[in-house]
Amino acid sequence: MTDCLFCKIVRGEIPAKVVYEDDELLAFNDIRPHAPVHFLLIPKRHIESLLTVNETDQALLGKMLATAPSIAKQLGLQAGFKMGVNTGAAGGQEVFHLHLHVLGTPQE
């Protein structure tokens, strides 16, 4: 989708502080963090929300859930973290590109 904010980040048209990237996923720091560590993990392919996920997206969603903890640990969240997905306008979703919020406070 050409006008999607997160698609523009994936294409490098908008800068972001990237904390992880592979062929299918991109993670970057949230611009309005709600915790000392707050990053978003997104699929590079545009998926609007959990409401539009289909069977072909299942492996990618599983990869997102499996990848998030390793990124969190690299950012100092070995003791734990929160994950959340806002889905649809009524669920608080503001950017309509599927994204997983990962938040926490590093423990010493």
Each language-model region and where it sits:
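HIT superfamily nucleotide-processing domains
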Residues: 1-108
